[in-house]
């Protein structure tokens, strides 16, 4: 989260008036993240998060907002978009598309244990199942097509060694995407960015998943792989912590058992998930936008993760006891 667009007191109060949500008492920019403008907004009626969308268009946004509402109605703990009397959930603030959602209680667990991983794995599977009947469809906008378009823009900033690894892995993923086994992977609406800092815990209770603005229709295995590459690793090396890895996968498996094709492709998809975030971090670092409070993430982290996934594949059959 970051602040690209300044929001005034009067602009925030105007939105609150429109939604009949009381008087503004505090408006505070949120540091962290790299896509949208975010504020903590407190009124006499409660605590909220105001998001102004800097890259997504008003045509793309209904998918994300209605997905959150769909999940919230089905008892998945996610922020619920506030709506006006006409049921509208997308508004305009400071000339940008905007939404207001309830603020989740608690804090992110940045040093998760196996127990945290078990809880998140369980809820991730429940979220995937809850979204099966979600009627809107939009591709993952940071998927393979975006990788193909973006890599040529960042190669000039890289060492020959990094360029070689990036191009080799991209070619591997392009080839994989054409395989029948890949095309057989189950799909649905996924979060696609469920890192540690996008989950809230209130003590040891999971209070919610948030920041759905990279969501899209993709394979459930990709979504699981994104999570495993963050929740279950040593952040210094990118290597898996076996206790957390086993806890996450087994919890997910108990709710939604992995198919044969998913078990076959879990290692290539772990590589895909690492590649996706290596590319986006390189892009954000070398082709940045101006913003208050913006902090670019270190792309070398996901270079290390990708290398760890390539050279140290996991043994899913052993983890699942097959």
Language model region names:
Residues 152-153, 277-322:
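ATP/Mg2+ or Mg2+-diphosphate-binding catalytic cores
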Residues 98-111, 149-157, 275-292:
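A glycine-centered beta->alpha junction motif in the catalytic cores
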Residues 221-257, 272-288:
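Active-site activation/catalytic loop segments of kinase-like enzymes and analogous catalytic loops
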Residues 1-85, 202-205, 318-322:
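Conserved NTP-binding catalytic cores of kinases and kinase-like/nucleotidyltransferase enzymes
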Residues 43-136:
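ATP-binding pocket architecture of kinase catalytic cores
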Residues 31, 36-44, 49-50, 81-82, ...:
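Active-site acidic catalytic loop and adjacent metal/ATP-binding pocket
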Residues 110-164, 185-187, 293-296:
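A cross-family kinase active-site recognition segment
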């Amino acid at each position: 989260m970051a602040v690209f667009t300044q929001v005034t007191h009067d602009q925030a109060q105007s939105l609150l008036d429109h939604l009949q949500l009381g008087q503004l008492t505090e408006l505070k920019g949120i540091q962290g993240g790299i896509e949208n403008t975010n504020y903590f907004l407190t009124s006499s009626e409660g605590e909220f998060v105001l998001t102004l969308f800097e890259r997504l268009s008003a045509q793309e946004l209904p998918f994300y907002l209605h997905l959150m509402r769909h999940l919230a109605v089905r008892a998945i703990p996610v922020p619920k978009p506030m709506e006006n009397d006409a049921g509208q959930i997308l508004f305009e603030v400071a000339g940008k598309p905007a939404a207001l959602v309830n603020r989740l209680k608690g804090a992110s667990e940045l040093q998760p244990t196996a127990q945290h991983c078990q809880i998140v794995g369980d809820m991730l599977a429940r979220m995937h199942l809850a979204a099966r009947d979600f009627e809107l469809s939009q591709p993952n906008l940071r998927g393979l097509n975006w990788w193909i378009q973006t890599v040529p823009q960042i190669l000039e900033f890289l060492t020959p060694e990094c360029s070689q690894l990036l191009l080799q892995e991209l070619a591997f993923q392009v080839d994989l995407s054409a395989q029948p086994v890949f095309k057989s992977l189950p799909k649905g609406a996924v979060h696609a960015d469920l890192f540690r800092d996008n989950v809230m815990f209130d003590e040891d209770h999971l209070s919610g998943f948030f920041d759905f603005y990279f969501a899209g229709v993709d394979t459930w295995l990709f979504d699981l792989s994104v999570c495993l590459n963050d929740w279950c690793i040593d952040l210094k090396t990118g290597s898996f912590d076996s206790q957390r890895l086993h806890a996450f996968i087994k919890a997910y498996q108990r709710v939604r058992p992995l198919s044969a094709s998913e078990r076959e492709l879990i290692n290539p998809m772990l590589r895909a998930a690492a590649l996706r975030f290596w590319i986006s971090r390189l892009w954000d670092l070398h082709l940045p936008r101006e913003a208050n409070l913006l902090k670019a993430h270190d792309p070398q982290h996901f270079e290390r993760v990708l290398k760890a996934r390539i050279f140290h594949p996991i043994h899913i059959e052993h983890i699942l006891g097959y």
